[in-house]
């Protein structure tokens, strides 16, 4: 066991980091766990676009992103959300490093559908060696949800999908998908554990619905690809755990 944990946090969560979150990250790092943080930034991007009077358009839940929009998207992710995340972690005594120019050497991507979504990408390859160098130096690499095409274009990537790709590439012991809900609910209570074999049954019986479906399906595929377990919840310790069996 390498004790690698990949943590995905949303843009809103990264702006409102709790003391418990920061303490747990510090405790894990002190205990020798190897951590990687992937973050989105939808809230910050929307705010920046509104301030610049740029309309927000989404298709199938994905942000349509023009080349001009990417200037605002990258600014929000790197200079606002990522920078704030790094500052807060360092103030808590955590050794970490935000990846900026390094991203082009880590996340290879291709256009999802340029005609429909513009500069939105899907991960094609993770250069895990760059990430491993940070881990070997006892630093937490912080990755924004961005990637680069083979033509050198910066692309906007779904943070859940990027975190999943990173976890699979590193053969992580655990992937934590932090969201704004406590986990998968059944009859009002959080399901503490679901095996990957139970996922389709829970979808078919409408226990898992709407926006939780892609998260759970992604989690099941992640476990099938060799990641030990996936936790979906609103914190680092509790929620719904997805395992192989």
Curated annotation (Swiss-Prot):
Function: Catalyzes the ATP-dependent phosphorylation of N-acetyl-L-glutamate.
Gene Ontology cellular component annotations, sorted alphabetically: cytoplasm
Name of the protein described by the UniProt record: Acetylglutamate kinase
Source species of the chain: Streptococcus mutans serotype c (strain ATCC 700610 / UA159)
Listed EC numbers: 2.7.2.8
Record InterPro entries: AceGlu_kinase-like_sf, AcgluKinase_fam, ArgB, Asp/Glu/Uridylate_kinase, Glu/AcGlu_kinase
Principal subcellular localization: cytoplasm
Catalytic activity: N-acetyl-L-glutamate + ATP = N-acetyl-L-glutamyl 5-phosphate + ADP
Coiled-coil boundaries: none
Keyword GTP-binding: no
Lineage, top ranks: Bacteria, Bacillati, Bacillota, Bacilli, Lactobacillales
PANTHER family (alphabetical): N-ACETYLGLUTAMATE SYNTHASE (PTHR23342), N-ACETYLGLUTAMATE SYNTHASE, MITOCHONDRIAL (PTHR23342:SF0)
